[in-house]
Amino acid sequence: MNIENYLSETLAKVFQKLGYAESFAKVVTSTREDVGHFQCNGAMPLAKFAKKPPLAIAEEIVEHIDAEDIFAKLEVAKPGFINITLAPKFLADTTNRFLNSNKFGVQNNLPNRKVVLDFGGPNVAKPMHVGHIRSALLGDALQRIHRFCGDTVVSDVHLGDWGTQMGMLIEEIKLQSPQLVYFDENYTGEYPTESPVTVQELAEIYPRASKRCKSDINEMEKARLATFELQQGRRGYVALWQHFVRISIDAVKKDFDSLDVHFDLWLGESDANKFIDEMISYFQANNFIYEDEGAWVIDTNKDGVPPLIVIKKDGGVMYGTTDLATLWQRSKDLDPDEIIYVVDKRQSLHFKQVFSVAERTKVVSEKCKLKHVAFGTVNGKDGRPFKTREGGVMHLADLISQAKEYAKNRMPDENDDSIIDQIAMATIKFGDLINNYANDYFFDLEKFAQHEGKTGPYLLYTVVRAKSILRKIFGDNYDIKSLAKDYKVVNAHNEYEEKLQLQLIQFPIAVQRAYENSQPHHICEYAYSLANSFNKFYVNCPINNLDDESLKKARIALCMATVKAMTIASDLIGISIPERM
């Protein structure tokens, strides 16, 4: 139950009764704790339509509200705010209801939807680096959130395995080892099962090939021709390319496993290749595509968005072509309600073109919503894209090792590597996801690793503290679900209990905002606020030495609720919580 929605519905009945539109009854969390828990600001915009002063409208609404079981206090403030304070029993009862629900008050979306999530997107032959973090972590959080809310999710890594870089690699290896059978056009036998290069060698070959092609137009033409021949099915090139893909996927899977990020599908641009001819024929049959200076293009019919080149002059396909073919494939195979792409904001124009063409040509059905979660860049302290001290791109594996070092340095007596791993992951993931995805942000690992402030380790520390209370009382194998039946939250005895209860019942609000806006930072902010409220409660509300047994049990229930809410919230952003720290 989203408490903002519940209160909005309660006030909407009064608005309707008085002849006002229900849309003005929206209730939001108060921006000032000193005046109330929630507020309704609808009287101000309503005044223009009702031809009344907003203060008079607010007073009229409050006068007609009859819900003493929900509200302890309703106050009107200029120019027309309605400040709402919840009744202590309603607050306690709602906390209990959430504690005893499987999803801490969150209800499944109805009807359930099928959502395809496209994220990760590493390129073959390139090791994963810091720049891949945002897509991987943001996409993983979104798939967790969508599944939690009841959607059927299909996640796809969508490998970059079919572009000009493949031709660059082929030509570079051909230059180094022309004797390999992959380059003999007359060879008809079976190709070797072992790759002629390792993934480490690929990572060295690609920069060299890229540099050569950028400095020599003839080399670039060779790479483009090799790419075209690969896409046309030249046997030796296909066999060599298959080695590139296989060894790259093995390496990439290890990187994603280290982040606890997983995919349902491991498809790439190449998997859409077999749909391109069928799709082009469809475009031609329906007069969507036309020739322009030797290339084949499709108009977007959107102001400021240029046409999409589908086939180049040389007959090769573009990045946009494979993206359209991927949409074609997904639409036919999965029939989704929504497809979400978690990709760098520098690709925004590209996705505007692809989405516009896909919708105009009905590559996707009318019910299917296309969304680009366009995230900002990961920058260093200097405000530029994050680099190593030597100025190079930091590989993901090196970043994780560095995070583990920070965790170990702050806990030198900790010998359990699994706990160090959990702290390192919390450091990286929370440090990234606490930021609104649309913004660039500074990646400061030293700051993220602190055990206080808005950090992952602080969250872990708080939950471990709450768990230790329960463990001292119930032993190691306690079960919150069964214990909650006998431990009930009661009306708050002080401001610390009240603020903790109020924070706990706002969990569904954070989840709904994260879900609707594809913004996991709402869950991060919620978890941080809950951690602060619990730590103040912990300091000011003793449990073990209490003589009042009913109060003791009520505070234990608040500890249970905190552990449950924090555990779910942490899982939604891909963070696992240790038993101790």
Swiss-Prot record:
Motif residue range(s): 'HIGH' region: 122-132
Entry-linked InterPro entries: aa-tRNA-synth_I_CS, Arg-tRNA-ligase, Arg-tRNA-synth_N, Arg-tRNA-synth_N_sf, ArgRS_core, DALR_anticod-bd, Rossmann-like_a/b/a_fold, tRNAsynth_Ia_anticodon-bd
Any GO CC annotation of this UniProt entry: cytoplasm
Subcellular localization(s) per the UniProt record: Cytoplasm
Residue ranges crossing the lipid bilayer per the database entry: none
Reactions it catalyzes: tRNA(Arg) + L-arginine + ATP = L-arginyl-tRNA(Arg) + AMP + diphosphate
Origin: domain of life: Bacteria
GO molecular function: arginine-tRNA ligase activity; ATP binding
EC supergroup of this enzyme: ligase
One Pfam family per UniProt: Arg_tRNA_synt_N
Keywords: Aminoacyl-tRNA synthetase, ATP-binding, Cytoplasm, Ligase, Nucleotide-binding, Protein biosynthesis
Enzyme nomenclature, EC number: 6.1.1.19
Chief place of localization: cytoplasm
GO biological process: arginyl-tRNA aminoacylation
Subunit structure: Monomer.
NCBIfam families: argS (TIGR00456)
Family: Belongs to the class-I aminoacyl-tRNA synthetase family.
Name of the protein: Arginine--tRNA ligase
Lineage of the organism: Bacteria, Pseudomonadati, Pseudomonadota, Gammaproteobacteria, Thiotrichales
